[in-house]
Amino acid sequence: VEELREAGIEPYGRKYEKINDIEEINKYDETCGKVFKTAGRIIAYRRMGKNGFGQIQDPTGKIQYYVKKDEVGEEQYEIYKKMGLGDFIGLEGKLFRTNTGELTLRVDSFEVLSKNVRPLPEKFHGLTNIETRYRQRYVDLVMNREVMETMKKRFQIIRFFRSYLEKHG
């Protein structure tokens, strides 16, 4: 957090105009040529020299992104290197497909929206300790998509019963 502040970036309390949900972006293919602007939480992150890959997630889905030092600039790439799992980031760029065929957002520019205070568990292993899953429910909801979907369905069922009982007394 202090490193970002020293670089002149406020790691909290920034307004960002998100134009595209990730679910919407995933409906396009790499030939559309459209510039997308989205935001989400970093759930996977790896750097390889002057390049970086990662995955962001918003409430509608997740997408892989690619950051290249030559495209974002050296100063921006140094800021990117300070990012980590759980941080919120705003991305702008076009789509392409990797050699493995995965749809990926090639980042032209990005903004740090919020720095994570506590690190999330690594994505590969996730939350394996049952006690931690129950005690830190908020982490389980972030890391496990199925748990989030189950919670949403539960809320919808409760909302239905409440509205039914209010109408039929």
What do these predicted ranges mean?
Residues 1-168:
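Class II aminoacyl-tRNA synthetase catalytic cores and aaRS-like
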